Curated annotation (Swiss-Prot):
Keywords tagged on the record: Acetylation, ATP-binding, DNA damage, Helicase, Hydrolase, Isopeptide bond, mRNA processing, mRNA splicing, Nucleotide-binding, Nucleus, Phosphoprotein, rRNA processing, Spliceosome, Ubl conjugation
One Pfam family from the record: DEAD
GO cellular component: catalytic step 2 spliceosome; nuclear exosome (RNase complex); nuclear speck; nucleolus; nucleoplasm; nucleus; TRAMP complex
Name of the protein described by the UniProt record: Exosome RNA helicase MTR4
Record organism: Mus musculus
Length: 1040
């Protein structure tokens, strides 16, 4: 028989054998029985008022045809062979990698990713002396990793913070130095590079540093550098690379950073195949996938050594706001104690409104701050210091630290030492800089053993505080989460002042990955028998969220690869490699390729299931199925009319019977108690009608009412007595409104009063065996909208078709209908899986690459045959800001008439990235150039939009922030740091960070000017560097 699933819906109207003549109109006229979507399976209650015969006659036929579904519900009958053929062509796409497990001791897993055509050769034990001896016994994972390095094979070491990953890196350095090879150690941030340089230098001496800010001994055998520097060395074909045998990537999990992660990916792709790697990472669940990518990319084995082992086990406590004690929720064996968790949440509930923060998750009442004080005091009394207190904003950090002024944790002897270290550190500052408020305010705190660490601090103070903390002279350190990155400074206790953070878009619970990274600072190896983590919670949290947060897994390493113009231009400039290659080889693309076999499997299984389902008289059943689907769709449209507040609110009086149904839960009938407008709807949130919340008395499962808010209530199971509870429900979740109203008791607090309402509801249902009567949208609710009338006409016509269909009264209807539904769902699954396949097979971002090349051609950076032009060569020199806009400005002569101070101030817009509430009032000498720059940016946005690149002009323009223009200008004219700090509300540390980035950009601008031979411009930028590079802004790092 032909396959019915290719039929369009209109075929419904072509079987005239059971035409309107045989219409069953003996259905009695009765009250509105609800929108057609609410029909039971056999369509028993779809009998709305049937109008005259013409409802299904000529006038409506065209209407109904138009309503037909856009595509066949079922495609052609799928054939298994098709997907097998697809499979064959996939073989070429799939990365040729296999993974072998290696036997190892407990508490550590060892796998190796190999090219598919290579056999695994077990690692050979070391012959002769080790490249480096250690004074302590190595852990299993360290021994395994060192064996890989001894065998000259790449390895990814994934372990918790402070588990001792650095040992593996040091060994690779020692081996390279012994073999007279060069080795590069890269780290994500300059501050971390400085610290690593210090450590490595003390260990090996033959060590250099390159961070962009500072270059020390660049001919050394071991070079510590930021990933950005390594990337530019690779693009420039630096000689150094020829001698490199090992590259060590520290904190490789940084690769998921949305802004800078792409630099790691570029660098790893550009590195030659003969180099070996050591990757150090926090715990990542998909470490094996990363190793497979490295193997696929560089045609060499890559080992994964993974351990969850913590040398010091952790205990996790919750401190509920308003309570006065700690609750152990995860013990040192990693077991989640649900009863303790629920007790803590109960304390929070009892503390009531006092502990309630406002909607944004900030502290409320007066208890907030004193809680931190209470806990810190308790930590000191129990001798659990040193403690790191994590807050999610710089302001909170400082506010909490200042509350500690009454406490003193240091002895007189320690105070003297703090003062000595502090004075030595700031010795390099000028007398004037020593008097800066930040410098003067922090010393009294430090002497009492209290420190602050966030991005707004002067770098020199930040480093002083790190040194004091590592020497045990700071007992309580108030820090933002940046302190959890990289630098190995463990404490005994970690305290979170909040479980929610603002991530630039909204307030949310912190992720389990963030929690793992920060809480990993607790517990010092060899000093503490266990680490303590305390989480302050001031908002109710369900056990699910709690468990997910405290016991969840680390965040996977997902690629954040995206194209940049600098990347595209550099790849066009380099002979051997093109941008398409970079896209194909990216981890981003690899992760999508890895999904292919799973999708193919899914298609295969679905098609087998599809072919197994045999429906007798299939064509007929499908016609009937489509009619019912269409009725359900129209039913939804009617519901939308009924839900409009102007129509339904007058009927939601107390006592009205309503049916409540949300996505997964059907509560059945309940009784309206009250309704109110939802207050916190944002005016621009795109919600046209204000949201109304109806309080409905519903039968809920007792379990769901136990430990969470009533919003999370679930319906009682059929066999459960349940409990009547008032639940807030949004209007659109009311699936039906009845004509019936019941009397409800005035006081609904006593359980008996609420349960009495349930008896009344059951009585109503007994009285109306055919279903509780519903409000008719036209007759009862008085909706006069023409649109609704049209929908009802269509419903009547479709119902007519349904009642007159031979299947409608068939005793087997239920069975065949369920089969048909199942088959339709499988057909949809197959369709979406095939779409997924198609997507996975195309190289991602290829369209964007085409658009970007189009922009480069139109702006004259490259020719139509992808040959780079002069403009493009200039743009290649600029990597730390918007290379397109800066090159355009240069070629348009925008900098020619500016003084070096003006040019420097204008460039600050490109490197300042923070938010400042104050917009400076700029003088014309700064506002003029800013306007010209914005005009130039508008032109680029316009060209980009014409080249079909998704770009929002306003967002693009607002990414250049002029907030520090006047500050930089004043600094460049010779003002003191104290003076410029008073000009803005931006933190001192942020000003310095902006200046240092600015100096880096000025150096790149010098190179760019040199590339076009414009000496005057080159000198102007060089003069800018001289003017800003002075005093505290460029005070050398204490680690160097």
């Amino acid at each position: 028989m032909a396959d019915a699933f290719g039929d369009e819906l209109f075929s419904v109207f072509e079987d005239d054998s059971t035409s309107a003549a045989g219409a069953k109109k003996d259905k009695e006229k009765e009250k509105w029985k609800g929108p057609p979507g609410s029909a039971d399976k056999a369509g028993k209650r779809l009998d709305t008022k049937l109008q005259s015969e013409s409802a299904s006659g000529g006038k409506n036929k065209r209407d109904l045809d138009v309503e037909g579904t856009d595509e066949p519900i079922f495609g052609k009958k799928p054939r298994i062979e098709d997907s097998i053929n697809e499979d064959l062509s996939l073989a070429d796409l799939m990365p040729r990698v296999k993974v072998q497990s290696v036997e190892t001791v407990e508490g550590c897993t060892h796998e190796v990713a190999l090219p598919a055509d290579e056999d695994y050769i077990p690692l050979k034990p070391r012959v002769g002396k080790a490249a480096k001896e250690y004074p302590f016994i190595l852990d299993a994972f360290q021994r395994e990793a060192i064996q890989c390095v001894d065998n000259n094979q790449s390895v990814l070491v994934s372990a918790h913070t402070s588990a001792g990953k650095t040992v593996c890196a040091e060994y690779a350095i020692a081996l390279a130095l012994r073999e007279k090879q060069r080795v590069i150690f890269t780290s994500p941030i300059k501050a971390l590079s400085n610290q690593k340089y210090r450590e490595m230098y003390e260990e090996f001496q033959d060590v250099g540093l390159m961070t962009g800010d500072v270059t020390i001994n660049p001919t050394a055998s071991c070079l510590v550098m930021t990933t950005e520097i390594l990337r530019s060395m690779l693009y420039r074909g630096s000689e150094v690379m020829r001698e490199v045998a090992w590259v060590i990537f520290d904190e490789i999990h940084y690769m998921r950073d949305s802004e800078r992660g792409v630099v790691w990916e570029e660098t790893i792709i550009l590195l030659p195949d003969n180099v070996h790697y050591v990757f150090l990472s926090a715990t990542i669940p998909n470490a094996r996938q990363f190793a497979e990518w490295i193997c696929h990319l560089h045609k060499q084995p890559c080992h994964v050594i993974y351990t969850d082992y913590r040398p010091t086990p952790l205990q996790h406590y919750i401190f509920p706001a308003g309570g006065d004690g700690l609750h152990l929720v995860v013990d040192e064996n990693g077991d989640f104690r649900e009863d303790n968790f629920n007790t803590a949440m109960q304390v929070l509930r009892d503390a009531g409104d006092l502990a309630k923060g406002d909607q944004k998750g900030r502290k409320g009442g007066t208890k907030g701050p004193s809680n931190v004080f209470k806990i810190v005091k308790m930590i000191m009394e129990r001798n659990f210091q040193p403690v790191i207190i994590f807050s999610f904003s710089k302001k909170d950090c400082e506010a909490y630290a200042l509350q500690m002024t009454k406490l003193d944790f240091n002895t007189d002897e320690e105070k003297k030492m703090v003062e000595e270290v502090f004075n030595n550190a700031i010795d390099c500052l000028s007398d004037e800089d020593k008097k800066l408020p930040q410098v003067e305010h922090v010393l009294p705190l430090l002497k009492r053993g209290i420190g602050i660490h966030h991005g707004g601090l002067l770098p020199i103070l930040k480093e002083t505080i790190e040194i004091l903390f590592s020497e045990g002279l700071i007992k309580a350190l108030f820090a933002t989460e940046t302190f959890a990155m990289g630098i190995n400074m463990p404490a005994r206790t970690v305290l979170f002042t909040n479980a929610r953070k603002y991530d630039g878009k909204d307030f949310r619970w912190i992720s389990s990955g963030e929690y793992i990274q920060m809480s990993g600072r607790a517990g010092r190896r060899g000093m503490d028998d266990r680490g303590i983590v305390i989480l302050m919670v001031d908002e109710k949290m369900s056990p699910t969220i709690g468990k997910q947060l405290l016991k969840g897994s680390a965040d996977p390493l997902n690629s954040a690869f995206h194209l940049t113009y600098n990347m595209v231009l550099n790849l066009l400039r380099v002979e051997e490699i093109n941008p398409e290659y970079m896209l194909e080889k990216s981890f981003y693309q690899f992760q999508h390729y890895r999904a292919i076999p799973g999708v193919v499997e899914k298609v295969k299984n679905s098609e087998e299931q599809y072919n197994k389902i045999v429906i007798p008289n299939e064509e007929n059943v499908v016609i009937y199925y489509k009619i019912r689907q269409q009725l359900a769709k129209l039913g939804k449209e009617i519901e939308e009319y009924i839900h409009k507040p102007k129509y339904c609110l007058p009927f939601l009086q107390p006592g009205r019977l309503v049916k409540v149904k949300n996505e997964g839960d059907d509560f059945g009938w309940g009784v309206v108690v009250n309704f109110s407008k939802k207050s916190n709807v944002k005016p621009n949130s795109g919600e046209l009608d204000p949201l109304y919340v109806v309080e409905v008395l519903l039968r809920c499962s007792k379990e769901s009412l136990k430990n969470s808010a009533t919003e999370a209530a679930k319906p009682a199971k059929p066999d459960e007595k349940g409990e009547m509870q008032v639940v807030p429900v949004l209007v659109h979740l009311l699936s039906a409104i009845s004509t019936v109203r019941l009397y409800i008791p005035k006081d609904l607090r006593p359980v008996d009063n609420r349960q009495s309402v349930l008896k009344s509801i059951q009585e109503v249902q007994r009285r109306f065996p055919d279903g509780v009567p519903l409000l008719d949208p036209i007759d009862d609710m008085g909706i006069q909208d023409q649109g609704l009338k049209k929908v009802i006409q269509k419903v009547e016509a479709f119902e007519h078709r349904m009642y007159s269909h031979p299947l409608h009264n068939d005793p087997n209807l239920e069975t065949v209908y369920t089969l048909c539904e199942r088959k339709a769902q499988i057909a949809l699954d197959i369709k979406s899986a095939k779409r997924e396949l198609k997507k996975a097979r195309t190289v991602l971002q290829m369209d964007e690459l085409k658009c970007r090349k189009r922009v480069l051609r139109r702006l004259g950076f490259a020719t139509s045959s992808d040959v780079i032009e002069m403009k493009g060569r200039v743009a290649c020199e600029i990597s730390s800001a918007d290379e397109l806009l800066l090159t355009e400005m240069m070629f348009n002569g925008l900098f020619n008439d500016l003084s070096s101070e003006q040019a420097t101030a204008l460039l600050s817009c490109f490197v300042f990235q923070e938010n400042s509430s104050e917009m400076p009032k700029l003088t014309e000498q700064l506002a003029g150039p800013l306007r010209q720059m914005q005009e130039c940016a508008k032109r680029i946005a316009k060209v980009s939009a014409e080249a079909k690149l998704e770009i929002d002009e306003e967002t693009y323009l607002s990414s250049f922030k002029p907030h520090l223009m006047d500050v930089v200008y004043t600094w460049a004219t010779g003002a003191t740091f104290a003076h410029i700090c008073k000009m803005t509300d931006v933190f001192e540390g942020s000003i310095i960070r902006c200046m240092r980035r600015l100096e880096e950009l000025l150096r790149q601008m010098c190179q760019a000017a040199k590339a076009i031979g414009n000496t005057e411009l080159e000198n102007k930028f060089a003069e800018g560097i001289t003017k800003i590079k002075r005093d505290i802004v460029f005070a050398a790092s204490l680690y160097l």
